[in-house]
Amino acid sequence: MKLLILTCLVAVALARPKHPIKHQGLSSEVLNENLLRFVVAPFPEVFRKENINELSKDIGSESIEDQAMEDAKQMKAGSSSSSEEIVPNSAEQKYIQKEDVPSERYLGYLEQLLRLKKYNVPQLEIVPKSAEEQLHSMKEGNPAHQKQPMIAVNQELAYFYPQLFRQFYQLDAYPSGAWYYLPLGTQYTDAPSFSDIPNPIGSENSGKITMPLW
């Protein structure tokens, strides 16, 4: 055993090189460069200036697309809200047009008023002239008068409608009944008494007439 140990030690001593290590004579600068090359990892290609510019462009384009999508959504929301506002406005215009256009019932009332006015009914003296003119213009088909609103005439005729239309329906059913409404200026005379009525004059033989028997 002792012989084996001695032979191993001699072999190791013989195998050791006689010259010193080369890097012992190198300067410190060369050692630092070698350390930087082998120890420090090289800068990756992803982080070069060109790649950084491309990445920044991609990020900018994505942000622009996102902003465009948001603007489009805002425009759609604004158009929907504006369309909702336009719908009630059109409905209001239709309602106003319906109010402006005279109905057949209203024209019938005006015709009754003008027809009864010819009978010199005293209650119909308060009928405004604007209603008569408007009725004539509607019959003639004058568009200027048809476009005018009917609100003013309705206000003028509103204060005597409830009192007169009960009589108008009766007079319409019986046209001759309009003559029974006498003017306010007429004076009523008392009816003659029975004593003033003259007795009928007959022949003397009128009481002696005999009826034939059948």
Swiss-Prot record:
Outcome recorded upon mutating S28P: In allele C and allele D
Residues carrying Phosphoserine: S27, S56, S61, S63, S79, S80, S81, S82, S83, S90, S130
GO biological process, one term: response to estradiol
Predominant subcellular localization, coarse grouping: secreted
Subcellular location field: Secreted
Tissue: Mammary gland specific. Secreted in milk.
Keywords carried by this UniProt record: Milk protein, Phosphoprotein, Secreted, Signal
Keyword Phosphoprotein: yes
Classification via InterPro entries: Alpha-s1_casein, Casein, Casein_CS
Region called Opioid-like peptide sequence, residue ranges: 105-111
Range of residues in the leader sequence: 1-15
Region named Disordered: 69-91
GO cellular component: extracellular space
Family: Belongs to the alpha-casein family.
Function statement: Important role in the capacity of milk to transport calcium phosphate.
This protein's name: Alpha-S1-casein
Naturally occurring in which organism (per UniProt): Ovis aries (Sheep)
Organism classification: Eukaryota, Metazoa, Chordata, Craniata, Vertebrata
